[in-house]
Amino acid sequence: MKNTILILFTAFIALLGFFGMSAEADPIADPIADPISGPNAEADPEAINLKAIAALAKKLFG
């Protein structure tokens, strides 16, 4: 059961990375953007929240 959940979780993260994270959408990759400011969550509401994903994985897998 745990292996199945781990495989599904890994596949989900891979799909998010494949479809959601491209160089064009990355504010850090923009040379015109202010280098001091980090990624703006308000500018990209569909941005992946890695901290929330890590917390969920930690909660699921102990």
Curated annotation (Swiss-Prot):
Organism domain of life: Eukaryota
Gene Ontology CC, one term: other organism cell membrane
Main subcellular location: secreted
Keyword annotations of the record: Amidation, Antibiotic, Antimicrobial, G-protein coupled receptor impairing toxin, Immunity, Innate immunity, Mast cell degranulation, Membrane, Repeat, Secreted, Signal, Target cell membrane, Target membrane, Toxin
Pro-piece positions: 26-47
GO terms for MF: toxin activity
In-chain residues carrying the UniProt-annotated modification Phenylalanine amide: F61
Tissue: Expressed by the venom gland.
GO annotation terms (biological process): defense response to bacterium; innate immune response
This protein's record includes keyword Repeat: yes
Residues spanning the signal sequence: 1-25
Localization of this protein: Secreted; Target cell membrane
Disulfide partners: none
AXPX repeats: 25-28, 29-32, 33-36, 43-46
Family note: Belongs to the MCD family. Mastoparan subfamily.
Known function: Antimicrobial and mast cell degranulating peptide. Has broad spectrum antibacterial activity against both Gram-positive and Gram-negative bacteria (S.aureus MIC=16-32 ug/ml, S.xylosus MIC=1.5 ug/ml, S.alactolyticus MIC=8 ug/ml, C.koseri MIC=4 ug/ml, E.coli MIC=4-32 ug/ml, K.pneumoniae MIC=32 ug/ml, P.aerugiosa MIC=96 ug/ml, S.choleraesuis MIC=16 ug/ml, S.typhimurium MIC=32 ug/ml, V.parahamelytics MIC=16 ug/ml). Is also active on multi-antibiotic resistant hemolytic E.coli O157:H7. Acts by affecting membrane permeability.
Protein name in UniProt: Mastoparan-AF
Organism of origin: Vespa affinis
